[in-house]
Swiss-Prot record:
Compositionally biased region (Polar residues): 1-11
Record's protein name: Uncharacterized protein DDB_G0280315
Annotated Low complexity bias: 21-64, 279-324
Species lineage: Eukaryota, Amoebozoa, Evosea, Eumycetozoa, Dictyostelia
Spans annotated as Disordered: 1-77, 132-194, 272-324
Organism of origin: Dictyostelium discoideum
């Protein structure tokens, strides 16, 4: 599996949260020890988590100054233990130099991936578990280290080196998966001039977007689709958010984009208004085992494309194509 990330913009901090079943109380008796170490050039944030309980969340966020970029720099780490799984991500943005460690323990199987992110070169290449793309098992340790010191354009579908292309195949079991293959395309595009609302709802699923980790980012979706927490902007830019194919879209200059209150409502606090999303259920999926949606978050100088297939007990594991 290859993940190719090209970022154009010095202070764009995406966070993508991806689970199927947060309410699954099956820990499988595993002791998952997690060590997170952020080694940013200007900020060192160390977070060591040893979790063996379901729904154990730990989030550290630091804001640092420094030169070389506009706005604040951020460093965060988080640890989640769900169903015997530790999911940990460290993300440092220190005005141009980033070292990110991504450590997973899925049912006793350890996956280590190291992000090396140089914001000056606007490019990140991330290969995740390129041995066999197999998530269930034990005793396997996969280490992937990728350094990008130039503006490499590696398997990008978009031009100008500001494409985030994330192909991620996962197949693991939990109680509430319901056999759905959750194929999701998340696109963050460079457009902050439109003000558009399309009141459509995809199967009345909840989606959450946060621009600040100072507020509680741990929000939960209705099953079967997992939830997403995305940091869309740094509070200084207009932002457009779109969900397709059954979509809504809006733009806001708010310093904080609030999560959806429920599956039919979102809140834009800069305008102090609630926008109801009508439920058209206009699903473009081929079958009931394939729930697909796109999320577009638009910010100047940042274009992200995330194409993820999270397969359940179906044959949709290879449905990863996104040329937008």
């Amino acid at each position: 599996m290859n993940t190719n990330i090209n970022v154009n913009g010095s202070n764009y901090h995406p966070y993508i949260r991806d689970y199927n079943n947060e309410n699954n109380n099956n820990n499988n008796g595993r002791n998952n020890n997690t060590n997170n170490n952020n080694n940013g050039r200007y900020n060192n944030n160390n977070n060591n988590n040893n979790n063996n309980n379901n729904n154990n969340y730990n989030l550290n966020m630091n804001s640092t100054g420094g030169s070389g970029g506009s706005g604040s720099s951020y460093s965060y780490s988080r640890s989640v233990n769900r169903n015997g799984v530790n999911y940990n991500m460290n993300y440092n943005n220190n005005n141009g130099y980033n070292n990110n460690n991504f450590n997973n323990n899925y049912n006793g199987q350890n996956y280590n991936g190291n992000f090396n992110y140089n914001n000056n070169n606007n490019n990140l290449n991330y290969n995740y578990n390129n041995n066999n793309n197999h998530y269930i098992g034990s005793g396997t340790n996969n280490n992937n280290n990728n350094n990008n010191n130039n503006n490499n354009n590696n398997n990008n579908n978009n031009n100008n080196n500001n494409n985030f292309n994330y192909n991620y195949n996962r197949n693991f079991n939990n109680n509430n998966n319901r056999g759905y293959g959750n194929n999701r395309n998340i696109n963050i595009n460079n457009n902050n001039n439109n003000r558009l609302l399309q009141n459509q709802n995809q199967n009345q699923q909840k989606y959450y977007f946060k621009s600040s980790f100072l507020e509680d980012p741990w929000k939960k979706t209705q099953h079967p689709l997992p939830d997403n927490c995305i940091v869309p902007h740094d509070g200084n830019s207009n932002v457009t958010v779109t969900v397709t194919p059954n979509s809504y879209s809006y733009s806001s200059s708010s310093s904080s984009i609030q999560p959806f209150n429920d599956e039919n409502e979102i809140t834009i606090d800069s305008d102090d208004e609630n926008i109801d999303r009508t439920s058209n259920n206009n699903n473009n999926n081929n079958n009931n085992n394939n729930n697909s949606y796109n999320v577009n978050i638009c910010r100047n100088n940042s274009n992200f494309n995330v194409n993820e297939n999270n397969g359940g007990d179906n044959n949709n594991d290879n449905n990863n194509d996104n040329d937008s």
